[in-house]
Amino acid sequence: MQLELVYEDHDILVVNKQANLPTVPLKTDSQDKLTLLGLVARAFPEVLDVQGANTWEGGVVHRLDTATSGLVVIARTKEAYASLQAIQKADLFIKEYQALSRSYKPTLLPGFPPYPYEDPFFCKGKEVSIGSLFRRYGDHRKEVRPVLADSPRHLLDKTTGTWYLTKVWYSGEVGESHQFTCRLSSGFRHQVRTHLAWSGWPIDGDIMYEGIEAENLALNAVAVEFPHPVTTNPMEIRI
């Protein structure tokens, strides 16, 4: 598997992750497991010297779900990593995704609260803000479920207390599927996947949230926007 480098300077790298490739290893994984971080480290070994809260994740600034493809930012220095963490906390690190959905499914999955927002498809290009807290759900807590501010206390207690917002708009047709563009700053595991499924538009290939079967998950991180961690110049990198 080859590394697709999209941007490089002395402080950061931006790479395009293939679908079904883990971004980083788990703490318990062997060193031989193939991950995006491992591929990057072959060409840029210094990224392993950058260690945040999880030392085994190197300089990876943000993760994509294994099934998701697209842009990942990786710091080459400890200083750049610390600066990018501060940028994320200030909600200045924006990620943009494109998702495809062929099937409208208004029936909620178990554990989902009633959907309180507009349907992004019927808004025809108007931005719809879908917000929630999240709780882990199901066997081995592999899935997540949105939680609203007025949800029962026993559900609220299972969240981190952070409100997550996905801005979604319908952006046309691709083949037989509808395309939705999604933007967010702070993110939670499966956030885009869950928010779209909640709205009635599960992503193609997302069997976990009742999307139709497809070769890969039709979710691609197509752009990142943030101030450069050293120069502070605005950056927009897009594929």
Where are these regions (language model features)?
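RNA pseudouridine synthases
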Residues: 1-239
